[in-house]
Amino acid sequence: MVARRAIGDPAEALKSEASDDNAEVLIELKNVRKSFGKKVVLDGASFKIRRGEAVGIIGSSGTGKSTVLRIMAGLLQPDEGEVIIRGRPRVGLLSDEKDPNLKVGMVFQSAALFDSLTVGENVGFKLYEHSDLPEDVIKGLIQESLAQVGLSGVEDRYPAQLSGGMKKRAALARAIIKEDISENDNPLEEVVMYDEPTAGLDPVASTVVEDLMRNLHTENKAVSSYEEKKGGVASYIVVTHQHSTIRRAVDRLIFLHAGKVVWEGTSKEFDTCEEPIVRQFATGSLQGPIVY
């Protein structure tokens, strides 16, 4: 069944066949609203992100995609509604949480690397600033994280010496770096959030980034039992306009329009969906409910 509901319908969207209803809900938004001045950006958005999912958030420009990503990441507070993290309502921002129950990694559209720092210093920035780990241990974690994204040996370079695609991968390495190496540590699972990760990249560089996102997730899912392998990238969420990312890097889609969730479905259903707003977005037609 195609998961959809009409614009403005208060009923919950039907669940996609891609969803595993038995998987734990890691993040849930309930009737989230957010305005900036008089501009309403989110107008009652509700959806769930479950463990194991690769989710794309799509929709035309200005429909609240990046805003909802930042609210999920705990970087922005909603005006109304609830953000529930593994069954526990979040109060305040991520930085206010004393005992987080889910690690969140954020990869921004611009990569957001500090030009005056080396790649290694960028990747390990949080550890250098906020941990008591020895420098040699941090350097080891930096090398491990860079190796995961295919950037071994670049830690002494500066961002200006990297291509656009390499900068995106360095930003991902920063998002997934381990924060604690204690043998008795019970590492948190992580949800990685990408804000238009392939924007500005050529098709080949885009494919590299898309496959990397998928591979990091797949490697963690390869161990079927949660008890066997704690930590790792449990799920990821991508805000994107790119059809290649929709088809290559995600399994389920959430379509935002006018600050509401108007359709949910699989990436396969996206190509055949007859919902007018989805069809217009998929085909790039000027005719339809999306007005420019």
Kindly give the residue locations of the regions a language model identified.
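Helix-to-loop junction immediately C-terminal to a conserved catalytic motif
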Residues: 73
